Amino acid sequence: MKEIVLAGGCFWGVEEYMSRIKGIVETKVGYANGIKENPSYEEVCSGTTGHAEACYIKYDESIISLEELLNKFWSIIDPTVLNKQGNDRGTQYRTGIFYLDEKDLNVIIKSKSQEQKNYRKPIVTEVEPLKCFYEAEEYHQKYLKKNPEGYCHIHLG
């Protein structure tokens, strides 16, 4: 099993979208790569913790490759916009690819470079090693499964 953490704006939609993909074994939403230990949702929303809303993904690479997973990720975000996805604005809504395995970096860089060909503006999606990931409060986990009418900036139809 492989792991990756993806930030694509509001984590509810990213988790729901990713959880529907064949080969995804587990998803959790949380707060990635900030400076405050174990922040609350309210603290992250204040913009003072440096965390991105993100989705931890465990996947079976015999079913889906990292390259395929990243292609799906690129399809649900606008990687050229800083600190905004859909109607959501703030540093916590920035896009990012946070890797746990250094060996994944070449695939990520190649994927980002390939995706850049689709845009005139530069891609601003962060590519960083995962420094920290704090699981979000329980009510955020599988939020759109529990609340199918909930807000989502990603088209899930």
UniProtKB/Swiss-Prot annotation:
UniProt family annotation: Belongs to the MsrA Met sulfoxide reductase family.
Keywords: Oxidoreductase
Catalytic reaction(s) noted: L-methionyl-[protein] + [thioredoxin]-disulfide + H2O = L-methionyl-(S)-S-oxide-[protein] + [thioredoxin]-dithiol; [thioredoxin]-disulfide + L-methionine + H2O = L-methionine (S)-S-oxide + [thioredoxin]-dithiol
GO molecular function: L-methionine-(S)-S-oxide reductase activity; peptide-methionine (S)-S-oxide reductase activity
Enzyme class, first EC level, given as a word: oxidoreductase
InterPro entries: Met_Sox_Rdtase_MsrA_dom, Met_Sox_Rdtase_MsrA_sf, MsrA_MetSO_reductase
Cross-referenced Pfam families: PMSR
Organism (species): Clostridium botulinum (strain Langeland / NCTC 10281 / Type F)
E.C. no: 1.8.4.11
Keyword Membrane belongs to the record: no
Protein name: Peptide methionine sulfoxide reductase MsrA
GO cellular component terms listed in the entry, alphabetical order: cytoplasm
